[in-house]
Regions:
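The feature captures the beta-strand-to-loop junction immediately N-terminal to the Walker
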Residues: 47-49
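Conserved ABC ATPase "signature" region
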Residues: 114-132, 241-242
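Conserved ABC ATPase signature
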Residues: 137-141, 145
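A short, proline-enriched helix->beta-strand linker immediately N-terminal to the Walker B motif
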Residues: 156-160
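A short, surface-exposed alpha-helical micro-motif characterized by mixed small hydrophobic
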Residues: 204-206
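ABC ATPase "signature
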Residues: 222-223
Length: 247
C-alpha cells in the first residue's frame, strides 16, 4: 500500500481517563497501544461491544480527546462526525436552514446569505429531502429525516473523512436500510472515506470494505468482512459473530 493511500494512521495510540471514586483517583485505560490505518476512500467498520473503545477512538482521531501515548496522523480535510442520536444532535429551537448554514459560517471560505441558502437547498436534495424542509424545526421531523439532516449538515464543508458513530441504531429497521443506502450513495459520489462505528456485524458485512474488531481497548482483528466472518482468528470475534447469528 502506498503512503498516499492512507488518510489516517495511528501508532501506539493509548488513551486513559482518571475516575474519581470517593477520595480516590483511579486511572482507566480505554485504548491501549493501537496501531491502525484508514485507507483513503474506504468504508472501515469499527466493531466491538459497548465499552470497547470505539467512540473514544473516533474522538481521538478528531483530536477531541488527548493521547496518553502514541500518535495519530491525519491527512483528512474538514473531518466530520455523525452521532447516534438524531434527536439530541440538532438544536430544537432552530430551523433546518439555520442548522445547515452554521458549518458554512464557521469555515474558512466566506459565503453570502443567498449562497448559503442555495447550498442548503442543494444539500437537502442530495440527502433526499426538498426545499420545503428548510423552515421546519427538528421536532417536526421523523427520526430518519433528522438523521438525513445530520448527514447533510456534516457534508456542508465537504469533508474528506466522515465518522459515523452508530448512525442508524436509533432508527427503525426499514429506515436504517434507507439511511445506509443514502450513505453508500454519498460515499460513491463524493469518494468519501467513512469510519463506520456499529455493534451490528450483519450491517457491516454488506456495507464495509474492511472491519476492525476492538476488545477492551485493543484491536484483536482487522480485515475484509468476508475473510473475518468466514474464518475468525480470535475467540472474541467468533463470539461476536455467534451473538449476531452469523456463525
Amino acid at each position: 500500500m502506498m503512503a498516499e493511500d492512507i488518510i489516517v494512521k495511528g501508532k501506539d495510540v493509548t488513551v486513559s481517563f482518571i475516575n474519581k471514586i470517593g477520595n480516590r483517583k483511579e486511572k482507566k485505560t480505554v485504548l491501549e497501544g493501537l496501531d491502525f490505518d484508514v485507507q483513503r476512500g474506504e468504508i472501515l467498520g469499527l466493531a466491538g461491544e459497548s465499552g470497547s473503545g470505539k467512540s473514544t477512538l473516533a474522538k481521538a482521531i478528531l483530536g477531541m480527546v488527548p493521547l496518553e501515548r502514541g500518535s495519530i496522523e491525519s491527512k483528512a480535510e474538514n473531518p466530520q462526525m455523525i452521532f447516534q442520536d438524531p434527536y439530541s444532535s440538532l438544536n430544537p429551537a432552530k430551523t433546518i436552514s439555520w442548522i445547515m448554514q452554521e458549518p458554512l459560517k464557521l469555515g474558512k471560505k466566506k459565503y453570502t446569505g443567498s449562497e448559503r441558502l442555495a447550498k442548503v437547498e442543494e444539500m437537502l436534495g442530495e440527502v433526499g429531502l426538498d426545499a420545503g424542509y428548510m423552515q421546519r424545526k427538528p421536532g417536526e421531523l421523523s427520526g430518519g429525516q433528522r438523521q438525513r439532516i445530520c448527514i447533510g449538515t456534516a457534508l456542508m464543508q465537504a469533508p474528506e473523512l466522515l465518522i459515523a458513530d452508530e448512525p442508524v441504531s436509533a432508527l427503525d429497521v426499514t429506515i436504517q436500510a434507507q439511511v445506509l443506502e443514502l450513505m453508500r450513495e454519498i460515499h460513491r459520489k463524493k469518494k468519501l472515506t467513512i469510519l463506520f462505528i456499529s455493534h451490528d456485524l450483519r450491517t457491516m458485512y454488506n456495507f464495509c470494505d474492511r472491519v476492525m474488531i476492538l476488545q477492551k481497548g485493543r484491536i484483536v482483528e482487522c480485515g475484509k468482512p468476508e475473510d473475518i466472518y468466514s474464518d475468525p482468528k480470535e475467540p472474541y470475534t467468533r463470539l461476536l459473530l455467534e451473538s449476531a447469528g452469523i456463525v
